[in-house]
């Protein structure tokens, strides 16, 4: 198993904790949608540690969705089915891979909590939705305006 960035760069050797976890996945092959996360000394996500390659050995993967499993394309399957399958294949992969639970219900409260934790934001998905790359009417991305990564992204957009 290998770890790739969105543009296709092989990052397997850069993140040893994730690479070790990939070897423990319960599958021959898979494509997981996730995000590499490094935490600060308080246990909160630190964009700076990822950006400046600090503590690469402590970076783990938050697994959000499962796109392909053992050669089978799962993108048309409902989100709740993909999440259940994802949970079962990453169950033994901690601490390098962490399953991102699907929280049903009170989106505004979850978003407020994510903002208090300094997270970049959340993505709300309809539980019966198919997987689509890019934007989807079934997925709503809400960004924390106080997050350093979001602020930097806005500044870069304004400078164009």
Where are the regions that the model predicts?
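Catalytic cores of nucleic-acid ligases and guanylyltransferases
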Residues: 1-160
């Amino acid at each position: 198993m290998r770890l790739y960035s969105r543009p296709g760069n092989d990052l397997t050797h850069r993140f040893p904790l994730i690479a070790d976890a990939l070897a423990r996945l319960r599958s021959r092959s898979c494509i997981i949608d996730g995000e590499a996360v490094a935490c600060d000394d308080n246990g909160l996500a630190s964009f700076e540690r990822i950006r400046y390659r600090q503590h690469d050995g402590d970076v783990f993967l938050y697994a959000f969705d499962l796109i392909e499993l053992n050669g089978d394309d799962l993108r048309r399957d409902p989100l709740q089915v993909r999440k259940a399958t994802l949970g079962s294949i990453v169950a033994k992969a901690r601490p390098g891979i962490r399953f991102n639970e699907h929280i049903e219900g009170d989106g505004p409260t979850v978003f407020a909590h994510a903002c208090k934790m300094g997270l970049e934001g959340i993505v709300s998905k309809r539980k019966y939705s198919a997987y689509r790359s890019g934007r989807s009417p079934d997925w709503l991305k809400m960004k924390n305006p106080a997050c350093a990564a979001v602020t930097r992204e806005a500044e870069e957009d304004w400078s164009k």
